[in-house]
A protein has these predicted regions:
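Short, acidic loop-to-helix structural element flanking the phosphoryl-transfer center
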Residues: 42-58, 105-112, 165-169, 222-236, ...
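Mg2+-dependent phosphoryl-transfer enzymes with acidic/Ser/Thr/Gly-rich catalytic loops
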Residues: 6, 19-28, 44-45, 218-300
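Conserved acidic, metal-coordinating active-site core of Asp-based
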Residues: 119, 123, 130-248
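Asp-based phosphoryl-transfer active-site loop
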Residues: 25-41, 116, 258
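Active-site phosphate-binding/coordination module
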Residues: 43-151
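Active-site metal-binding loops of divalent metal-dependent hydrolases
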Residues: 33, 68, 91, 249-251
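Short, structured coil segments at secondary-structure junctions
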Residues: 80-82, 89-90, 98, 204-206, ...
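Non-catalytic pre-domain segments flanking phosphatase-related domains
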Residues: 1-31, 50
């Protein structure tokens, strides 16, 4: 932990804003989506999309790197010519977009999912199943989303992106091929209580670990899975140095990725932990911080 105040840390890691020349070499770019590449209201930023155009022109591969399931990622980003790979479900799946094949996976077993469900089923929390590229939820828990006190924009996104099912969880889990990760959200008003209960339940299932992108939810992964591990795996697969990787993020689930990348860059709306892990801090997600840093890094 730095002894600097948050304001001092930001000032130190934004000093690049006053420098004309970067002398950096960017070979690949990774970015979180929500609260980082996207506006807070989940809309696309025109400057960030223009930067993807520039990356495509330069032949620099871009990899959206998100806690979202593949089918829930912004289509305009996934289908952009710059996007060559996708890291979805916090690093559980790495996909090559040119061939639509999964290059690497680090997934949750059906047995682990069922064991965790048994521990959480009596709590008023969601039990989100990220499987086969989609997100699924018991209908009764889907109806719970609107009652949790989650910010309206995010609650609406959750409802849109999750497909309710009417069969039992056991039957549903049996019907899918691959469980990429799990997730659980709880009431904002009782956040501390349920955060502790869910964290304890996750810790009691061998081979699972939890990370968070919001204070009222937990993203549940196979142990050892992270965006950072995925970044390192993909750079190694492509024969690229992580020193020449730029990565952007804002949440706890981005810390490992920002640490792993030579040009780990936190948006100014990120958490203190991201500021600590990053080499650089850029502008906020609503100020096209992604584009602003890369404009400088690429010497544009």
């Amino acid at each position: 932990m730095s002894e600097l105040s948050t304001e001092e840390l930001i000032a130190q890691k934004q000093s690049w804003l006053t420098q004309d020349v970067s002398n950096l070499k960017v070979d690949i770019v990774f970015s979180d989506m929500d609260e980082t590449f996207l506006h807070t209201d989940k809309s696309l930023d025109a400057k960030n999309m223009e930067m993807l155009d520039r990356l495509a022109e330069l032949g620099i591969p871009f990899a959206p790197c998100s806690g979202r399931a593949f089918n829930v990622l912004p289509k305009e980003v996934v289908n952009h010519p710059a996007s060559k790979y996708v890291v979805s479900c916090d690093g559980a799946i790495i996909r090559d977009l040119s061939t639509q094949t999964v290059l690497h996976e680090s997934t949750v077993t059906k047995e682990q999912a069922l064991e965790l469900y048994q521990k959480l089923k009596d709590y008023p929390v969601t039990f989100d199943i990220f499987a086969d590229g989609g997100v699924y939820l018991e209908r009764s828990r889907h109806n719970l989303i609107s009652q949790l006190g989650i910010p309206a924009e995010h609650a609406a996104f959750m409802q849109r992106s999750r497909t309710p099912f009417d069969q039992s969880v056991e039957e549903f889990i049996d019907s899918v091929t691959t469980i990429e990760r799990l997730g659980s959200y709880w009431s904002v008003a009782e956040g501390e209580k349920y955060q502790a209960l869910v964290a304890d339940a996750v810790a009691s299932v061998k081979g699972l670990s939890g990370t968070a992108s919001m204070s009222m939810g937990m993203e549940i992964l196979a142990e050892g899975t992270s965006k950072g591990a995925a970044l390192q795996w993909l750079c190694n697969y492509l024969g690229l140095s992580t020193e020449n990787a730029a990565a952007f993020g804002d949440s706890l689930n981005d810390v490992a990725m920002l640490s792993a990348a030579g040009m780990g860059t936190a948006v100014a709306n990120a958490r203190r932990e991201d500021f600590e892990a990053a080499a650089y801090i850029t502008l906020t997600n609503d100020e096209a911080g992604f584009s602003r840093f890369l404009t400088w890094a690429l010497g544009e």
